[in-house]
Amino acid sequence: MTIKLRFVASLALVFGLAAASVPAQASGGDTPHLQSWSFAGPFGQYDKAQLRRGFQVFQNVCVSCHTLENGGFRNLPSRAAPNWPLDEVRQLAASWPVQVKDINDKGDPMQRAPKLPDRIPSQYANEAAARIIHNGAVPPDLSVIAKARTFQRGFPWWVTDIFTQYNENGVDYIVALLNGYEDPPERFKVPDGSFYNKYFPGHIIGMTPPIADGLVTYGDGTPETQLQYSKDVAAFLMWAAEPTLDVRKRIGWWVLGFLVIFTGLLVATKIVVWRPVKKGLA
């Protein structure tokens, strides 16, 4: 078999496997709709106002069950985002309802209010305590949920995603999940204490519908709807999972610019160096 035929056969195998994988992916749950995000694409940046609203939703709704182990109060005043005033973050940490464990000057264990350098404390003493409260289940930590929970778009969309640089599967899934609660179809049995969600794999989820219209009060005039809440908290969780996204993209463009200029200089140097040699050989 020639190299060309092997290449064609390999492409056919890849596309065939991709096409065959679509039903398996779709059977786990409906495909979420794509949302519009300020941080999408190569030029995208976080919307600081949206991140603040998202943290507000997390603080008032999500934190009652979920943790944010990798999240720290010190990250909130970050110049990248959400860029909160330092004094406000200090007050926020001091008023946080869960205290942190520490050691006093005498070496005895104590509890105190969180400070700016601290991580956002967990409301559970340990995993066993979380299981007791939630009937044997442990609510997932949300630190990297926007990157860990996602969905596959299947063929041919993964091909176009290479060029559009679509990488927001996780936040699209979060928005879909928070808005996917509905009555189950006929003859679909949902166990007591569980709920039907068309976007959750298997469609049976143990989490109570967490948000509803008017649940959180915004102070900037943003619509206080379930869909808006879900978008805002999804954006915040994306920032929690990738807080340096803004910086990474800005540095990336500087690097690409440097490579373009450096490549041009190399080409020009090659022309200048080899032009006399070529003339001498002519």
UniProtKB/Swiss-Prot annotation:
<keyword id="KW-0349">Heme</keyword>
<feature type="signal peptide">
    <location>
        <begin position="1"/>
        <end position="24"/>
    </location>
</feature>
<keyword id="KW-0813">Transport</keyword>
<comment type="subunit">
    <text>The main subunits of complex b-c1 are: cytochrome b, cytochrome c1 and the Rieske protein.</text>
</comment>
<feature type="binding site" description="axial binding residue">
    <location>
        <position position="207"/>
    </location>
    <ligand>
        <name>heme c</name>
    </ligand>
</feature>
<dbReference type="InterPro" id="IPR002326">
    <property type="entry name" value="Cyt_c1"/>
</dbReference>
<keyword id="KW-0249">Electron transport</keyword>
<keyword id="KW-0472">Membrane</keyword>
<keyword id="KW-0479">Metal-binding</keyword>
<dbReference type="GO" id="GO:0009055">
    <property type="term" value="F:electron transfer activity"/>
</dbReference>
<dbReference type="GO" id="GO:0005886">
    <property type="term" value="C:plasma membrane"/>
</dbReference>
<dbReference type="InterPro" id="IPR036909">
    <property type="entry name" value="Cyt_c-like_dom_sf"/>
</dbReference>
<protein>
    <recommendedName>
        <fullName>Cytochrome c1</fullName>
    </recommendedName>
</protein>
<keyword id="KW-1133">Transmembrane helix</keyword>
<dbReference type="GO" id="GO:0020037">
    <property type="term" value="F:heme binding"/>
</dbReference>
<keyword id="KW-0812">Transmembrane</keyword>
<feature type="binding site" description="covalent">
    <location>
        <position position="65"/>
    </location>
    <ligand>
        <name>heme c</name>
    </ligand>
</feature>
<keyword id="KW-1003">Cell membrane</keyword>
<dbReference type="GO" id="GO:0046872">
    <property type="term" value="F:metal ion binding"/>
</dbReference>
<dbReference type="InterPro" id="IPR009056">
    <property type="entry name" value="Cyt_c-like_dom"/>
</dbReference>
<feature type="binding site" description="covalent">
    <location>
        <position position="62"/>
    </location>
    <ligand>
        <name>heme c</name>
    </ligand>
</feature>
<comment type="function">
    <text>Component of the ubiquinol-cytochrome c reductase complex (complex III or cytochrome b-c1 complex), which is a respiratory chain that generates an electrochemical potential coupled to ATP synthesis. c1 functions as an electron donor to cytochrome c.</text>
</comment>
<keyword id="KW-0732">Signal</keyword>
<feature type="binding site" description="axial binding residue">
    <location>
        <position position="66"/>
    </location>
    <ligand>
        <name>heme c</name>
    </ligand>
</feature>
<keyword id="KW-0679">Respiratory chain</keyword>
<dbReference type="Pfam" id="PF02167">
    <property type="entry name" value="Cytochrom_C1"/>
</dbReference>
<feature type="transmembrane region" description="Helical; Note=Anchors to the membrane">
    <location>
        <begin position="253"/>
        <end position="273"/>
    </location>
</feature>
<keyword id="KW-0408">Iron</keyword>
